[in-house]
Amino acid sequence: MSELAETTQFLAGREPWSLLPPGEAAAYARRATASYVRRGTQILTAGSPNSRMHVIRSGAVEVRDADGVLIDHDEEGHCFGQSSILEERPSRFTFTATEDTLLWSFEADVVRQL
């Protein structure tokens, strides 16, 4: 299976892409950027501007508020970063990889189209 086909299949099985008409997930998959994040790396920091939504393809990410309180632990299939884009404000949370993590990321204009 090609990387594009794998990305499309993965996205098509998750919201919001699963709500799109058939075939549209592929258009979004073409706009995804893959990145590998090492365990312990902060991906997004509370209070910082954000222009990308991230989808966890593999690995795990912890979510902490600005005071460092653990809010959530996200794994494969979870998205983060979209709320700060849609609300046009800095991130309220810090996202840190708790495992080596593969992310698929989307620019703000793609998020707004969804």
Segment roles from a protein language model:
Residues 1-114:
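Cytosolic regulatory regions built on CNB/CRP/Popeye-like sensor folds
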